[in-house]
């Protein structure tokens, strides 16, 4: 059952005597060939092979006199490949030392300085009042007290607190002797 062909439509804008040219439908082979051509053109739209590594080839614009430096190159200082016996030493003027060497304090002077330290006194007062110090202040107190102990040991100075401990130990020894002997008045 074939259907009848439709009558060709007339172009409204064109005069009645002129007919529009009928477009011919492309065959499958022609469509495939055009698609391959489009694909081939699309495939070659990027840079050519090696364009990233061969910078010189892509930058040829007729500037043969001025060579552009490769931006990927690091240091501009030439590296000697052979060790030469004559090494040219660059003589640099020695900087003038403006630093005045601080005189080193004797242990007695350093101990006196640390014992009269106002910051240490204030921090120790805060500790006596049961205040909590931050890490920096606590570290300062610890370091300073350790240094004072080391200086006192070096100078042979002992703290006066040891006398109370000695008296307590003597009292305990006396009590132990009394218990062992049984009679406090028995002496040799």
UniProtKB/Swiss-Prot annotation:
Gene Ontology molecular function: any one: GTPase activator activity
- Biased composition (Polar residues) is annotated at 47-57
Highest taxon above the source species: Bacteria
Which InterPro entries does this entry report, sorted A to Z? YihI
- Which proteins does it associate with, and in what oligomeric form? Interacts with Der.
Name the job this protein performs: A GTPase-activating protein (GAP) that modifies Der/EngA GTPase function. May play a role in ribosome biogenesis.
What name appears for this protein in its UniProt entry?
A: Der GTPase-activating protein YihI
